[in-house]
Amino acid sequence: MARDRSDAKEETVKSVDALRDFIIGLQDKDGFWKAGGQLPSQKRPISETNQVSTMICLLGLATLDQPNEKMIESRDKAVAWIKSTPPNGKDPAVSGEWYTMRLVVAKKFGEPKDVEALRDQILAAQQSDGGWGWLWADKSDAFGTGLALYALAESGVPSSHPAIERAWKFLIETQTDAGSWIVNGTKTPNKDKLHAMSSFWGSTWALLGLSKSLLDSVMKTATASTLPAVQSPIVSTGTPTAKP
C-alpha cells in the first residue's frame, strides 16, 4: 500500500511480483487470510482479526497497476468473503481498525450504501477529545485516531469537516517532543502503560492519517509550532507537547 509507484526498476518490479505471489499463496481457499504473528493475541475476537488481515491484504493487492488473472481471482474471492462474513457472528466489531478498513474496502470496491453507513458509524464514535481508541470502548489514542483520519479522508470527508479538525487537534496535542505518539496496551498487565509495538503502529497511522487528510495548502502553511513534524515512528518515552 505504501510502495513507491514511481520506481519501475526491474529489480523493484520483480520484488513486488514476488510479494504479490507470496500473499496470494497464503490466502485460504475460502477467500480470507488468517492473521499471524502477534495479531491473534490482540484484545478482540480472532474472527475480527482475520477480517482485518484480509482487508489489508486485499487493499495491498488492489494497488497493483496491472493485475494478472491469478490476482483478480484472489481479489474477487476476498471481496466475496468479506461481504458474506460478519466480523464477530451476531456481535458488532469492537476495534476501530475493523470499521476503518471496512470503510476503505467499501469505497474501493463500489459499495455506496456501506460507505455512508460506515462513515456515519466512525463519525459517531469520535470521543469528546477529538480522537478514537483502537478499541472503541477505550480512551482515544493515536492508533485509532490515525486510522479514522485515513479512512474518512479516503472515503471523501473533506478536511474542513469539524471531525477532521478535532482529530488533528488531538494528534497535535498528544505528539511527543521526539515526534512520536505514545499508545498504551489494551490488556492486563500492560493496560494503561506504554506499549512499544502499539506506539510504533500508532505513530505510523497518525502520520498516515495526517498526510491523507491534510490539504496541500495546509501542509505548506503549517508551522513546526502548530503541526510538529513526525521525525520518526520509532517509539519514544518523551512527554506529549500538550495535554488533551
Segments predicted by a language model, with ranges:
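An alpha-helical repeat/solenoid feature that recognizes helix-turn-helix modules
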Residues: M1-D21, K29-R75, S84-D120, S128-K169, ...
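Glycine/proline-rich, flexible active-site/cofactor-binding loop segments
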Residues: A78
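Compositionally biased, proline/threonine/alanine/serine-rich low-complexity intrinsically disordered stretches
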Residues: M219-P244
